[in-house]
């Protein structure tokens, strides 16, 4: 193989590695966003479980947020301690006793923790692959400079 052909092949391989690194970077960004969403959902489930635990306490005043941003908050003195509404998915809710709600929330927490673990594993593998490609590209760049 001629030197020119070898240089052409090397250039194509470098371009291929660069494309792979770019694709991995996008994939890593997507995984990080997905992980952040899952962790946010996990925290919301834990907060909901804590709220269910608070229902059983006597003589408590509750704050009910009118929206997600807290633009309006209602003080509530009386809450039915025997029933809660729990979101089942899509636009479905069920009225259940607090213990059933805790069971549903425990299951949801376990599912989200498993999803988080899987995403973190995939993220770790992707970052390792990206770093390996970046190292190769860095070495190639260093050899070009010599």
UniProtKB/Swiss-Prot annotation:
Annotated GO MF terms: unfolded protein binding
Keywords assigned by UniProt, alphabetized: Chaperone, Cytoplasm
InterPro entries: PFD_alpha_archaea, Prefoldin, Prefoldin_subunit_alpha
Recorded superkingdom: Archaea
CDD domains: Prefoldin_alpha
Protein's cellular compartments: Cytoplasm
GO terms (BP aspect): protein folding
Primary localization class, coarse: cytoplasm
GO cellular component: cytoplasm; prefoldin complex
Disulfide bonds: none
HAMAP family listed in its UniProt record: PfdA (MF_00308)
Biological function: Molecular chaperone capable of stabilizing a range of proteins. Seems to fulfill an ATP-independent, HSP70-like function in archaeal de novo protein folding.
Family to which the UniProt record says this protein belongs: Belongs to the prefoldin subunit alpha family.
Assembly with partners or alone: Heterohexamer of two alpha and four beta subunits.
Protein name: Prefoldin subunit alpha
